[in-house]
Amino acid sequence: MISVFDLFSVGIGPSSSHTVGPMRAARTFVAGLKADGLLTDVVRMRAELFGSLGATGHGHGSDRAVLLGLAGAAPESVDTDGVDARVARIREQGRLALLDTHEIDFEPDRDLTLHRRRSLPYHPNGMVFAAFDDGGAEIRTRTYYSVGGGFVVDEAAAGADRIKPDVTPVRYPFLTGAQLLDVTAATGLSISGVMLANEVSWRSEADVRAGLLDIWRVMRECVERGCSRDGTLPGGLQVRRRAAELRRSLETDTVVPDGDPLHVMDWVTLFALAVNEENAAGGRVVTAPTNGAAGIIPAVLHYYTRFVPGASDEGVLRFLLAAGAIGVLFKENASISGAEVGCQGEVGSACSMAAAGLAEALGGTPAQVENAAEIGMEHNLGLTCDPVGGLVQIPCIERNAVASIKAITAARLALRGDGVHAVSLDKVIKTMRETGADMKVKYKETARGGLAVNVIEC
């Protein structure tokens, strides 16, 4: 099974599939060379990006991520403030130190190719890395796929049409929403309780709790950074940061908040904008479950901790565990990759997870939590991924804010009912998968349709 820490991982913006994944793949390739004693034989490297990676790689920073990964950087620890200077130095010098130890000639314009119209068979986000010796002979070639949320699968697993599963036995295995509800009925556990029992299969309960609270800390720090920085986002669209200005407006608002019943929603919008502006700027974020949708769960969690009486760290833990359980269902039965199923797989999944998490934290029954997740996804079906300029800015940043409000609405609506509803979460996940399969490629993170072409034409 997938762990909650696979779904919530610390990384770098602007994209989990297009930045975090390529960085991990590149680092894995050169680390493998070193492990086999081949790294010092390398004189030249070649990297190729295909499909959605090739089409929007420049806007998503995929090319930069590959350079950093080859140099040994890891998404969870790379110095985000030093990325620009490090990449610029590689480009200016035409030299790259593999794993920061073995230096070779590397000209990005020659040795790093983005194929805008070519795809590999398994997944739209394909990469090929090759290493050569001083005689030009190939030392090793490997193919990797970035399948969403920072997950990377190599060619062998892709050929088996699956990611190699973790064989660690968990206490309460489940692959569908129906199975999850059956487990809760049989054990009397909440959804977060089931997930916690499973997480203990990998690490101690104390480590699970500490790890999740650390994830929450990184989310809070991301919001704080986003709320403190003005200016224009990189990439050429001249998108202005709005979170800092909105925060100042809310903090100095002379209008009595009690006079506006929707005042809290402005704060939720702020929290989401802050995260996604940081993500667009290449800052430190938590995949939740992807970078493109990274603002939704932190925004709804901030809503819970700041505006719900009696909110606690225990509630935060229940929120993240329940959200993770729903994320497992999307990852196992559909996709969280915009390049595979459109934005319904990213923002839709995150909205569903956040709705479930909030319903859990507010004391919902398993049936109500499942209902909240279903509502959150149902009303994101068909959502396209059409980033203007191939950047994770328009419509992505505002879309996270809107989905955060939608997640809160879904949770509150579910909690007003008894959990009985006409459409199951499993049916909605199946529908999302089928809708994504039917969706044209131009609406799946290629910047060749929708807003990506109409905004520029206007």
Where are these predicted regions, by residue range?
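Accessory "access/gating" subregions that flank catalytic or transport cores
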Residues: 203-342, 450-458
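Short, mixed-charge aromatic SLiMs
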Residues: 44-57, 89-97, 244-246, 319-332, ...
